[in-house]
Amino acid sequence: MVDLVKTILLIAYWYGLAVGVSNFEVDWLTGEAIATRRTTIYAAVHNASLITLLILFNLGNNSLKSEFISARYLHEYFFMLMTAVRISAVLLSLITRWYQRSRFIRIWNQILALVRDRPQVVRGRWYRRSIILKFVFCVLSDSLHTISDVSAQRKRITADLIVKLSLLATLTTIFNMIVCQYYLAMVQVIGLYKILLQDLRCLVRQAECICSIRNRRGGVYSIQCCSLADQLDLIAERHYFLKDRLDEMSDLFQIQSLSMSLVYFFSTMGSIYFSVCSILYSSTGFGSTYWGLLLIVLSTASFYMDNWLSVNIGFHIRDQQDELFRVLADRTLFYRELDNRLEAAFENFQLQLASNRHEFYVMGLFKMERGRLIAMLSSVITHTMVLVQWEIQNDES
């Protein structure tokens, strides 16, 4: 029987190689990442060709500069800004992946070693569901976005326009693949956190059972407490190493995170604004037909779901750390104290969690948290309302 998740990972891996996002190979027998000559040459040629096409595109008659001069509607100016932001985000991300390639390979192999020690991570229901959902909505978002671009320009299709749309579709695909690789790495880290939580819950239950032992002068009680203390120290060591890998990943994906924030901000504004423009008049190319509006609704819904999965995955890390605190706090409900060594092990682990919490800052500009996300959504809605009001006023005049 075909393993759906393994098939999805294979498709993502080969697709990442094909579009020049991955500049190293993975041995599927061992899972080890290595930099090979053929992959390096292919990725370098692909990226250089892409940059050359972008330069030629901006020097031609249909460049962003010429379109900016000939634009008549506000939504045309806005989508040129979106295109410029997306191009800049892709180029910055690709450049980052070249000069930090050795770090990408090292963190890949380190995460792989952790997963190899805990193979139940890849067999977990949450892990499989997360990968399948991301694949479905990423494919839907990418496909519907391409169909929307072609449908909006269907009345003036030319050879130059086909090249332009193909180039923009390639950029969109590259950006989505970069986000997908970040997502897959975070899913594996969260899977490791879930295994860590399971082991900690089991240990706390065992410690609670030990509390019921009345005769504490015998050797059985001391041996059991020492055994649990050793297990807790190992769990704390696993958490420290996993947290260290997570901090390195956060530092490694700084440019990609900033690019994601900018692209998602403008794309969310653009999808709402473009929907309103399609209803107001037919200059967008959809002509407000039922099929056109249905395409907009489906494209917007899949785009938002894909974005939400990519953004929310980072918040799950903080949720797992908060859950570690709550599980350790259950120790205070025990009706009797434990052995001194086991109590010290619990206190040391709590101190480690309190002093080494994961805080993710995007290029030192702002901290990624749910409150910040709500503020960004509020800003998106406010700016979109301003654009829509301006469009309605000019449409009436």
UniProtKB/Swiss-Prot annotation:
Subcellular location per the Swiss-Prot or TrEMBL entry: Cell membrane
One Gene Ontology cellular component: plasma membrane
One annotated GO biological process: sensory perception of taste
Pfam families: 7tm_7 (PF08395)
Protein name (database record): Putative gustatory receptor 59c
Membrane topology: Multi-pass membrane protein
Function summary: Probable gustatory receptor which mediates acceptance or avoidance behavior, depending on its substrates.
Keywords per UniProt: Cell membrane, Membrane, Receptor, Transducer, Transmembrane, Transmembrane helix
Tissue spec: Expressed is restricted to taste hairs in the labial palps. In larva, is expressed in neurons of the terminal external chemosensory organ.
Gene encoding the protein: Gr59c
GO MF annotation: an example: ionotropic bitter taste receptor activity
Ranges per topology, Cytoplasmic: 1-3, 61-75, 188-259, 306-372
Main localisation: membrane
Extracellular topological segments: 25-39, 97-166, 281-284, 394-397
